[in-house]
Amino acid sequence: MSAYLFGQLSDPNIKVLHPYFDKFIDQAANIEWDITKDILYIEGEPVTDLDSIFMRSNVFEENTPKKYNNYYLMSNYIQSHKVVKYNKKYHYETVTKLHNLIIAKQLGLRIPHTEVTEKSNRTDTILKPVTGGQHTIEGNTAVYPCIIQQKITGKNKRLYVINDKHFAFEVVTDKLDYRDDPASSVIVTEIDNVTIEKVKHLMHRLNLNFGASDFMEDEEGLWYLETNTNPMFVAFDKQVEGKLSKAIRQELNNI
């Protein structure tokens, strides 16, 4: 049996994982699924040895209809077969940032003051879309309902959890959203064990066994922001000399 990697090598996150997997399926490949006979074909050849898989949709190139549909074809195939995959029981089809904030709060993680509205009476706030995909900006007024959240000034921290393993990092930047800062850098850091256990409990509640949780840290401590279910990791992996990508591959065997 074989461990498969699905994505495209123009995605640096897939490229760094490529050496650790037995076989690779390009997201733009010719993929067919004969549902009547229940046979999956890749480039005309039947797949008979698919035991586990890591999947990532390529956001570094245009998402053509073929690539879009290939991703969901494979997702549906994996879901209906005994194939090991991270977050396989995570069935939410829509973004659940707001739901996750409520669960995090229930578990004792501190969250910033948060409203979903078009205008807040609070000042010193930031705006971000409910569905994600856009960068965070300052403000308290939007033209449609957005997340309007207390602005926390401090350190950006990220905690990766892969089954029972974890890796903690800080993104060093002077920008509100580090994605707007080409000079941002990543360093290894520490997050206290109490917070780590709460995040693991949160992920268990969400049926996740792989993800990255983002925090801000100020003089009062850590503030939970969100959990990403398919995060980018290549810049972080470099700081631990490939240990993150190796863990992603190895922990597939422990699900």
Regions found by a protein language model. Give the residues of each.
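Protein kinase-like catalytic core scaffold
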Residues: 125, 167, 211, 223-225
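Extreme N-terminal starter segment of soluble prokaryotic enzymes
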Residues: 1-4
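Hydrophobic, aromatic-enriched interface-forming segments
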Residues: 98, 107-109, 113-136, 143
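Short acidic-glycine loop/turn motifs at beta-strand connectors
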Residues: 36-37, 161-165, 218-220
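Phosphate-binding site of ATP-dependent enzymes
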Residues: 125, 129-206
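Conserved N-proximal alpha/beta basic substrate-recognition cap immediately N-terminal to
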Residues: 9-111
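A short linear hydrophobic-aromatic micro-motif
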Residues: 113, 146-148, 210-213
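C-terminal active-site "lid" helix and adjoining low-complexity regulatory extension at the edge
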Residues: 190, 204, 208, 217-255
